[in-house]
Amino acid sequence: MTVVSDRKCDVLYLHSTIVNQVCDNMDKMTNAERLEAIVKGELPDRVPVHDVACITVSKAMGYVWKDVRYDAKVSAKITDEFNKLTGSDFEFGPLETPAMFMDLGVEVSQPDDNYGNVMSQYWKESEDIEKKDLYDPLNPKESVMMRKGIVDKIEAYRKVNSTGALTSGWSWGVITTAGFLRGVETLLMDTMMEPDLAHAAINKSAKLVDGVMRAGSDGGDYIWVPDPTASGTVINLETFKEFDLPYTKDLVKGWKKDYGFSIIYHVCGDTIPIMDAIPDTGIDILSADHAIDLAEARKIVGDRIALMGNVHPIDVLWNGNAKMIEEASLKCIEAAGKDGKFILSGGCEVPRDTPIANIKAMMDVGKSYTY
C-alpha cells in the first residue's frame, strides 16, 4: 500500500480545518436545509458546493487506486479526511463504478492507478437481450463485486462521516447502463434500426439501475445519477425523449416516493439540445458539463429545476490557480445562481491529480457567496 504524508499536507489540513470551522460557524443552515431550499426555489444562506470528487480522493490522500478499489474501510476513512480538507457540502467518495457490471462476468480492466474499464459487451448478440438476465442488486450473493466497489464504500463512509457532508445513493443512468451492456455504438444503431430491441435493452437496464440505486440509498441524503450517454453530443432530442426520458422519469418517481430524496442528474457534454426536456424527467438538479453556457441553460429551464456546475475541471480546477478558480466560480454563480436554485461545482468529475488547494479554493467561493 502506498501512503504519502508530509508536512505540507499537515499544514493544509490545519489551515483547512480552521477555515472550514469559521465558515461552518457563519452558516445559518445545515447542508440538508440548504439543499431543500434550492430545490424549493427558496434562497439559501449561501451557495452550496459539491466537489464531485471520486478517484481524486485517493490520489489527494496519498493512495494508489488499486489499494482503495475494493477497500471500504480505507475508502471511508480517506473520504472523511478529504472532506475535512475541502469542506464540500456533498460527498460520495472513491467509487469503482465499473463494478456495477462485474457480477455479470464482463471483462473489466484493472489499471493500478485509475478506474477499471468495461472491455466487453454482455449483450453482444441481439438475442442476448432476451436470453441473458441481469443480477439482482438487492441480493448480496448475486452482487458481490458491485457491493465491494460501490455500495460497501457508500455505507462505510456514512458510518464515519464527521463533517455533515450529504451522502448519496449512486448508479449510472438508464441509457448509459444500456450502453455499457450492449455497447454504445450498437445501442445507438439499435435505436435507429431496431427500436423495439433498444427499448428491451433499456427497460432491462432500468431495472438494474433501480436496484443498484436502492442498494446504496438507505440512510443517505440525495441521489446522484450520472448519465453521460444521454448527452446532446451523443443523441438528439427525439432519441432522448423516446429512449431515456420515460425510463428515467419512472425511476425518479419511485425513488422520490420511497426515499423523498432530491435527485441530481449529471449529463456530460452539450446538453443544450435536450435541455428543455430534462425537467420532464422529474429530477431536481441538473449537474451541467463545462461545455455549456449556464446562462443559456437557466434561460431554457427557468425555475423548473436547479442547476449545478460548471467550472472547467481540467483547465481551471486541475491546472488553474486560486485567482482563475475564483473568477470562474463567480462567473458560474452570476450566470445561474444569483437568485438561488444553484450548486457550485466542477463541470464534471474533478480529475484525479487535481490539487486539494484548488478544490478548496472553489469551496471558499461558494461558502463566501451569501444571499
Segments predicted by a language model, with ranges:
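Conserved FAD-binding subdomain of flavin-dependent enzymes
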Residues: 75
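Glycine-rich, N-terminal phosphate-binding loop and its surrounding beta-alpha-beta segment
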Residues: 79-107
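N-terminal amphipathic/basic-hydrophobic helices that include classical n-h-c signal peptides
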Residues: 1-25
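Active-site loop segments of alpha/beta catalytic cores
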Residues: 20-21, 26-59, 63-68, 78, ...
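Intrinsically disordered, low-complexity segments enriched in small/polar residues
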Residues: 2-8, 103, 114, 162, ...
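Compositionally biased amphipathic helical and low-complexity segments enriched in hydrophobic
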Residues: 2, 13-15, 83, 135, ...
